[in-house]
Amino acid sequence: VWNGDKSDDAQLGKLETLPFTVLFVDGNHENFDALNEYPIEQWHGGKVHRIRPHVLHLMRGQAFELQGRTFFTMGGAQSHDIADGILDMDSPDFYKRYDALRRNRGQFRINHISWWQEELPSNEEYEHARQTLERLNWQVDYIITHCAPTAIQRKISASFKPDKLTDFLEEIRTRS
């Protein structure tokens, strides 16, 4: 899930040996090219990527019923370490820019290597999330996310800027 190659196997193998099922939502630095290669299945009422038999990625905007409780999931997050930009390896000046940014300790990421546009939910994922919450009358027992709603994020650190996802999570917080 991290590199999208055989190097992931050892770490995923360790997770698979744990005496429980590992569940996770995605964040902002996932390898979405690799993650989206895994099969999608229905699991406890919502969609998952099955990474291993006991390692599951809980997809965005889903509701899961576990032990009589409802869990709503909304992964994703805005990268805060890209002040100097996102580089494209296909750009003719990639190596020049990369070397300069590394020398100056720049804050940057590389498209489809360390940054993916999918770090934030798509409009379709927001729409699906709203439909899921409407079906549940915006009442769930637990909300699992990677980032916090805007009001909570402000209490944690003023350096984090609100974005569409944190505002959406704030809407959920105030409506639930």
Model feature map: region roles:
Residues 53, 67-159:
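Active-site-proximal loop/helix segment associated with metal-binding centers of metalloenzymes
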Residues 1-66, 158, 162-165, 169, ...:
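Core catalytic region of metal-dependent phosphoesterases/phosphodiesterases
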